[in-house]
């Protein structure tokens, strides 16, 4: 899988599938099943390390897990998250992004919009592929007042649209849209020539991502609205992954019950 193929998917209308992975074993299963993208996510702070948020994930953590996933996945496009405070300025961002690329990432992802213009541009100038992340931004959960849907009011929605257009103009290859109204995600997706990957953003994004642990029902307590357990009706993990891929490709997931 490569960036050109993702762009072709957008043009043809075929949906892009994405799951998180943190180790070689899960990555190899997802890869064999034909997942399009594997995100080595800083969500490992929640599901691997047991934290309440992603803020304590370090660059060393991300490099370690990127190396592990790379050993298991050779076909899917590998995207690695840049963790909290790893891109506070453009030079720091470039240094840390290069560490993830050396570890095996083919693209790096970081949260935020126009406030990171310098980092987006320095990546573009250094030919480092970038995935953006707009809407709910887990690394800013404290500043944003908790985990909640973004883009419900006009000011917030306008900012998401403005940021998305700016990111595309600065060479960003893909944008994740998290927890925004489905109609806003549709508007953003239709306004861009690059693919969007939704999580809690409705069926009209160009692709869908879930945290793999959520997709497999490995959670206790609160479960976000956008999550579906694909293992519960499947016999094993491979079958669950195949069911997720099929549901995304045929647009039966996410349904209205998973959208805002």
UniProtKB/Swiss-Prot annotation:
Compartments it resides in: Cytoplasm
Superkingdom per UniProt: Bacteria
GO molecular function: 3-methyl-2-oxobutanoate hydroxymethyltransferase activity; magnesium ion binding
SUPFAM superfamilies, per the entry: Phosphoenolpyruvate/pyruvate domain
Obligatory cofactor(s): Mg(2+)
Amino acids binding 3-methyl-2-oxobutanoate: 42-43, 81, 109
Enzymatic reactions: 3-methyl-2-oxobutanoate + (6R)-5,10-methylene-5,6,7,8-tetrahydrofolate + H2O = 2-dehydropantoate + (6S)-5,6,7,8-tetrahydrofolate
GO biological process entries: pantothenate biosynthetic process
GO CC aspect terms: cytoplasm
Oligomeric form and interacting partners: Homodecamer; pentamer of dimers.
Family the entry assigns: Belongs to the PanB family.
Protein name, entry field: 3-methyl-2-oxobutanoate hydroxymethyltransferase
Organism: Ruthia magnifica subsp. Calyptogena magnifica
Lineage, highest ranks first: Bacteria, Pseudomonadati, Pseudomonadota, Gammaproteobacteria, Candidatus Pseudothioglobaceae
């Amino acid at each position: 899988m490569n960036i050109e193929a993702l762009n072709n998917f957008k043009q043809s209308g075929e949906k892009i599938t994405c799951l998180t992975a943190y180790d070689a074993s899960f990555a190899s299963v997802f890869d064999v099943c034909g997942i399009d993208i594997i995100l080595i996510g800083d969500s490992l702070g929640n599901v691997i390390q047991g934290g309440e948020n992603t803020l304590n994930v370090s660059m060393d953590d991300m490099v370690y897990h990127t190396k592990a996933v790379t050993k298991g996945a050779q076909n899917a496009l590998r995207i690695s998250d840049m963790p909290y405070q790893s891109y506070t300025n453009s030079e720091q961002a470039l240094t840390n992004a290069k560490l993830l690329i050396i570890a095996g990432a083919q693209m790096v992802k970081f949260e935020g919009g126009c406030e990171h213009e310098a980092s987006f541009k320095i990546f573009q100038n250094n030919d480092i592929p970038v995935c953006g992340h707009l809407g709910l931004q887990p690394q800013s959960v404290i500043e944003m007042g908790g985990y909640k849907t973004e883009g419900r009011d006009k000011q917030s929605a306008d900012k998401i649209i403005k940021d998305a257009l700016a990111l595309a103009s600065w060479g960003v290859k893909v944008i994740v849209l998290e927890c925004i109204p489905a109609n806003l995600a549709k508007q953003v997706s239709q306004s861009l020539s690059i693919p969007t990957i939704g999580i809690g953003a409705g069926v009209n994004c160009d692709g869908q991502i879930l945290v793999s642990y959520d997709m497999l029902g490995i959670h206790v307590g609160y479960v976000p609205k956008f999550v579906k357990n694909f293992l519960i009706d499947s016999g094993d993990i491979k079958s669950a992954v195949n069911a997720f891929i099929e549901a995304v490709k045929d647009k039966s997931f996410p349904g209205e019950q998973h959208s805002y």
